[in-house]
């Protein structure tokens, strides 16, 4: 079982590397890692489990965050309508996105970042992601709102990008052009 001890923190060079594509069909080792990742995210949202194992609640995790430089992400998040998006994916890729942008009014956080980084993180309002599910099926997801933001955050990790790289350095709370805030 993964715990916070397995989550590497900012400053570790793995977080700045571009992760490798996962060879498909996925090996047993990669499948096990991805299963552990989605279990970690789900467990972190369960108050009892989070307390028992000292887990910081999270809604997404990318393999580089546990020291595995491979293109794998786990997301477990509910949108504004209460729809659950729970996905464990290999080789996710954003294949299209809206022109319109959004940002979380409270900013973003990250399990690999132990400090608060104030500022708006510009994200696309809508994205389409293509990936391979943990069961080996090709999936295409059309996402908007919080799920779209979470997927962009996790896919950034696969490209060595941290959320705070997107924050305007001169004016952290400048609303990005063509954007509307998303409240969480």
From Swiss-Prot:
Its cofactor is Fe(2+). The active site is at residue 154. One of its GO terms (biological process) is translation. The keyword Phosphoprotein does not apply. The keyword Ribosomal protein does not apply. Pfam families: Pep_deformylase (PF01327). It catalyses: N-terminal N-formyl-L-methionyl-[peptide] + H2O = N-terminal L-methionyl-[peptide] + formate. Transmembrane segments: none annotated. InterPro entries: Peptide_deformylase, Peptide_deformylase_sf. PANTHER family: PEPTIDE DEFORMYLASE (PTHR10458), PEPTIDE DEFORMYLASE 2 (PTHR10458:SF8). Removes the formyl group from the N-terminal Met of newly synthesized proteins. Requires at least a dipeptide for an efficient rate of reaction. N-terminal L-methionine is a prerequisite for activity but the enzyme has broad specificity at other positions. This is Peptide deformylase 2. It comes from Bacillus cereus (strain ATCC 14579 / DSM 31 / CCUG 7414 / JCM 2152 / NBRC 15305 / NCIMB 9373 / NCTC 2599 / NRRL B-3711). The gene is def2.
């Amino acid at each position: 079982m993964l715990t916070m001890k397995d989550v590497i923190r900012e400053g570790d060079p793995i977080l700045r590397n571009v992760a490798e594509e996962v060879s498909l069909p996925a090996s047993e080792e990669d499948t096990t890692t991805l299963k552990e990742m989605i279990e970690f995210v789900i467990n972190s949202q369960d108050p009892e489990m989070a307390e028992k194992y000292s887990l910081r609640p999270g809604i997404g995790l990318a393999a580089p965050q546990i020291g595995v430089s491979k293109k794998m992400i786990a997301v477990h998040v509910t949108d504004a309508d209460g729809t659950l998006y729970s996905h464990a994916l290999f080789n996710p890729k954003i294949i299209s996105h809206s022109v319109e942008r959004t940002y979380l009014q409270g900013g973003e956080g990250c399990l690999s970042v132990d400090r608060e980084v104030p500022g708006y993180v510009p994200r696309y309002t809508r994205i389409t992601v293509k990936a391979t599910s943990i069961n080996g099926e090709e999936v295409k997801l059309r996402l908007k709102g919080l799920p779209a933001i979470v997927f962009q955050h996790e896919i950034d990790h696969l490209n060595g990008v941290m959320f705070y790289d997107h924050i305007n350095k001169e004016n952290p709370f400048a609303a990005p052009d063509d954007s509307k805030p998303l409240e969480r």
